[in-house]
Structures are given as C-alpha cells and as structure tokens.
Amino acid sequence: MLELKDPSLLKQQAFIDGLWVSADSGETFAVTNPATGDELARIPQMGAAEAERAVLAAHRAFKPWKRKTAKERAELLQRWYALMLENQEDLARLLTAEQGKPLAEAHGELGNGMSFVQWFAEEAKRVYGDTIPQPSADKRLIVTKEPIGVTAAITPWNFPHAMITRKVAPALAAGCSMVLRPASQTPLSALALVALAERAGIPAGVFSVVTGSATQIGSVLTGHPLVRKFSFTGSTPVGKLLIGQCAETVKKVSMELGGNAPFIVFDDADLDLAVEGAMLSKFRNAGQTCVCANRIYVQDGIYERFAEKLAAAASGLRLGNGVEAGVTQGPMIDENAVRKVEEHISDALEKGARLIAGGQRHALGGSFFEPTVLTEVTAQMKVAHEETFGPLAPLFRFSSEDEVVELANATEFGLASYFYSRDIGRVLRVSEDLEYGMVGVNTAAIANEMAPFGGVKQSGLGREGSRYGIEDYLEIKYVCLGGVDR
C-alpha cells in the first residue's frame, strides 16, 4: 500500500477546467508498480470529447491569464514551487511507485524538475522586446513578444515529474495556458502536480491534465485549431507522426525525440572519472533516459582497463524495489522494454561480442534486468544503430580521434554526446566536430534549468530550459507607428 503524508495527492480523477472529473464513459485503466506488480490506482480512460473540453477551457482561460502581469504569474509559479518543496517526500514516493526508479533518483528528478518552475517564474519577468531604428523620421518601429496562446504537451513515463515541469512552467510563465496528456504508465505524478498547481491558485483552465487514450487525446491536441503550440517528448517515429498532424493547422512544435548518444573515452582521460560518468550516464534510471550513453567508444590504450573497471562497478549495483534502502537500480518499465534489451544482447553475442557482466533477467523476476557490459562490440550490431533504452553498456574500440568522431556522428540522431580527455586542444576540436545539440566534456551530468536542452537532426526541434526555453511559447509582433513627426 502506498503511504503518503498527504493521501489527497494520490488522485484517481483527471483535472479539466478546475474540476476533478472521471471519464465520460466511466472507463478506467490500472496504474501498477513495476517493482511489485501491485495496482496503485485506477485512472480515467478519457478520449477526444474530454480533450476537446480541456482545449476549450484553456482557450477561455488564456486571455485573463495573459493579461496578468509577469510579476503576478511569477508569484503563482513560486507558490507552486513552494508547495512542491513542501510535499517532495510524497511526490518522490509517488514517482518511485509508478515508475520504479530508486527513491534517491526520484528525489534527484524532483530537484531537477522543481528547478525549472523556480527558473521560469523568474524568466516570466524577463521577456523583453526591442525598438528598431526607424527608416524615416515619421515612423517608430517596436517589437514585442507575446504568449502564443493555448499550448498542449504529451510527456513520457521515464521522468514523469521533470518532463512535465520543463514544459508547463515556461508555458505558464509566458502567459500561455496548457493541456497536458501524461504517459499512461505514470499519470500519478502529473495529477499530483496539477493538484498542487490548483492549491497554488493557478486559475481554472490554465493547466488541465487529461488521462487516457494516446491516439484520441493526441489527435485533438495536435489537430485542434485553437491549440497554437504543441510539445512532445518521446520516440522519433511518434514525433514524426505528431509533426505531420500539427502541420494541418501550422502549429509551432517542440520535439525532444530519440537519441543514440556516444560516450567517448580517450587514452588521456581520467579513467576513474570516465567510469563514474559512464555509470551515471548508462545506468541511471536503469538506462531508460533519452540522453543515456548508448555507444561507449574506448581508445585502444585503455580499453581493457576501462572494461574491467566498468564491469566491476556495474556488478556492484543493487537491484530491488526503489523504496528499499540501498537499492541503486529499479525495474525496467515493462516486459517490452526487457525484450528489447534481450534482443540487443542476443544480436551482439551472435555477431562476436563478449559478455563480461550481467546479461540476463535478474533473480527478482518481473522486469528487473541485470546491469550488462559487452566488449568487442562493432558497428554491424543492432546496439550501434538502435536506442536500447535499458541497462546495457556496449564497448566499442577505436584508434584515432578522426575515426571516433566519424563513428559518433554516423547516426540520424543528435541529442546528447559525451567525451573524456585532458587535452585542451582535443576538447575544443571534438566539441566542435560532434553533431549533437549537447556535449558533455569530462562530465555526464549535463541537464539543468539554466542550459538549453535539445537535439539536432532527427532528435528534435526547439530547446527546453534556459532563457531560450521560454521563447518557444512566445510570438514576435512588430508594430510600425506612422505620422509621429507631426
């Protein structure tokens, strides 16, 4: 049984136009704990009709919200942030229960997610326009930035708190309203967040959460003419489909899509620091992150030593229910996720890779999978081209800088990349040559509220976080004043 200090944060209804509501059909779906299989809650299985009502409510709420001063919106966001801080233990327990990650990681996600609310509360007061030198004496040229209107978002299950706050916070700070459809595996965090937003005094209709059918709700959010901006975090194939749906009404879109992150370790790297970074990048959240190391390239001179150290560190992870003390890796989200890891391991071993750690389902059963390390991995294996999204670390060999940069860039993806070196010239060269939206040099901890998060190529469009993040929720308006010299 899930025990919370404030049991009212465990919501089993959706939130539309300031009201807690069930599905029109009365249908529900179960949310289960991936560590135990226990049912946590039953959530409304909503569809197009409920999504339509949420959009109309957001449209009605938009103008009054837009007309609030930046300071007023900032104060409400700060109240929301304060309530998250006050309830962070319950929020962490909800997150671990529905998603599976260890409690320590859940607290880490909360810290990151809450920081976006605090940051954008301040950025609300820093949306500046311009004046442009006029072409003639009788004119004045003014540029303003205005909220785009009703916005919508679909968020994933791997970070059910942070993926929401980094979309909702800039939207509300800019003066937009937002309709959110969270992943069906992890809706409890979203519902707790909107409950706290309600307590903070954010007006009805400004932030609604609709749970249920991805197809039906998604079709409304991408196709409705009143929705002017759509944000999505998820796979590249689904992102492409959603972009096509948004094209019918020419919506502004933000997409944070798939990755195939290279993690490069040069001979001159601090070996222990590189192993520490690889552990964080590869095994955090059981490898279920869009920016996790998917291909680990290690230079010939340190390959064996790195492999030995990484295998030892991976074997030292303790698997279990995330609420138990000392657990450092939880379960994978579901059976399909486990099967993909097994498929990549099997394919690699058939083609000549060597298993030096893990490689199978854990004795705990369910969707627990052992942290796995493979050596002698080559570009002909599936793991070189497909995002594993699991606790599998494949080690590739390389000889030269030029070779590894070419290998790292040989993908349609371009989200995150990492490399370790103590040569300043190499640091500058490789940083410039890697075709990725984000590059971590001698660190795997790159995500924070002050930096622009996003990818290039088929990894996405737009940026989240930083001063650039609020721009995706603004439109530029140019005003030309004539006859002012009279």
From Swiss-Prot:
GO terms for cellular component: cytosol. InterPro entries: Ald_DH/histidinol_DH (IPR016161), Ald_DH_C (IPR016163), Ald_DH_CS_CYS (IPR016160), Ald_DH_CS_GLU (IPR029510), Ald_DH_N (IPR016162), Aldehyde_DH_dom (IPR015590), Aldehyde_DH_Superfamily (IPR050740), Succ_semiAld_DH (IPR010102). GO terms for molecular function: succinate-semialdehyde dehydrogenase (NAD+) activity. Disulfide bonds: none annotated. Keywords: NAD, NADP, Oxidoreductase. It is an enzyme of class 1 (oxidoreductase). Its EC number is 1.2.1.97. NADP(+) binds at W157, N158, R181, P182, A183, S184, G234, S235, L257, E387. Induction: Is highly up-regulated during growth on sulfoquinovose, compared to growth on glucose or succinate (at protein level). The active site is at E256, C290. Catalyzes the oxidation of (2S)-3-sulfolactaldehyde to (2S)-3-sulfolactate, using both NAD(+) and NADP(+) as electron acceptors. Is involved in a degradation pathway of sulfoquinovose (SQ) that allows P.putida SQ1 to use SQ as the sole carbon and energy source for growth. This is 3-sulfolactaldehyde dehydrogenase.
